[in-house]
């Protein structure tokens, strides 16, 4: 929760500051982004350099079999497969924040500063949820909570889609970030506790691929749906589909729905039997 909260703090500051910096000079946000990306790239290169030295000291490079072991483990572990795919489709259908520029300009009629606030609102809600989870990390009926917060995420998208009030739209997006933080926390905790130590890195890599794919595909789906249906119907339909997913997933993944306390998860108790 603390790690995700730190990431969300940056997500809050970035869009809000970007909107106001754009007012000063339109090209300035891009210049700032380039500088920050160069710094990030330098950090990544430093990590890769250290990793290369570690392999030279005795560790071998992983082969394809070890890479695919993470995918195979997710496929045969119902709680992991259910949590990851639920997040994938929820973001695919319900992640309508990519349409924020269209809503800011044509529906809410706010400027670049308002757009920055719209983009920052989900992260602001996520920070609040992250602080709450850090203070009280233990959840009862975590599996059911996961489905409830995913349905709530879809409901907030519907509210955002039909809203013509800027404060209401901000509130809807903030609540979407709040409930999405609970979803991310539950999913990431399931991934950590339901996975053996020797597979944890590879399973985490599978999760990251799903997360990245859902974000990018969700943005594409939102734009395509808005072009076909219009912005408001696209957002409302996406939110409704997300609620349907939250209702359909429990019967498909009953092991996920039965989870009570996350800290009680054990890898050997979550793996489906293999033939």
What do these predicted regions represent?
Residues 1-275:
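Alpha-helical transmembrane-bundle signature of multi-pass membrane transport and export proteins
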């Amino acid at each position: 929760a603390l790690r995700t909260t730190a990431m969300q703090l940056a997500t809050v500051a970035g869009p809000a500051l970007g909107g106001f910096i754009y007012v000063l000079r339109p090209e300035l946000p891009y210049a700032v982004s380039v500088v920050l990306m160069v710094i990030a790239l330098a950090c990544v290169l430093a990590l890769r350099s250290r990793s290369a030295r570690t392999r030279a000291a005795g560790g071998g490079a992983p082969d394809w079999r070890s890479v695919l072991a993470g995918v195979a483990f997710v496929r045969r572990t119902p709680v992991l497969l259910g949590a990851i795919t639920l997040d994938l489709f929820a973001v695919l259908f319900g992640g309508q924040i990519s349409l924020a520029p269209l809503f800011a300009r044509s529906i809410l009629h706010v400027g670049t500063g308002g757009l920055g606030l719209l983009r920052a609102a989900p992260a602001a809600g996520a920070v609040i949820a992250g602080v709450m989870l850090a203070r009280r990390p233990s959840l009862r009926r975590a599996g059911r909570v996961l489905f409830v917060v995913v349905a709530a995420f879809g409901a907030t998208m519907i509210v955002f889609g039909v809203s013509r009030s800027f404060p209401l739209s901000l509130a809807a997006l903030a609540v979407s970030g709040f409930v999405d933080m609970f979803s991310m926390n539950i999913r990431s905790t399931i991934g950590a506790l339901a996975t053996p130590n020797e597979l944890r890195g590879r399973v985490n890599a599978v999760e990251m691929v799903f997360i990245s794919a859902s974000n990018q595909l969700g943005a594409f789906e939102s734009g395509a749906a808005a072009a076909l249906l219009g912005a408001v119907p696209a957002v409302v339909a996406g939110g409704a589909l997300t609620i349907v997913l939250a209702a359909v997933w429990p019967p498909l993944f009953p092991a996920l729905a039965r989870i009570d306390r996350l800290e009680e998860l054990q890898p050997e108790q979550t793996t489906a039997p293999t033939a």
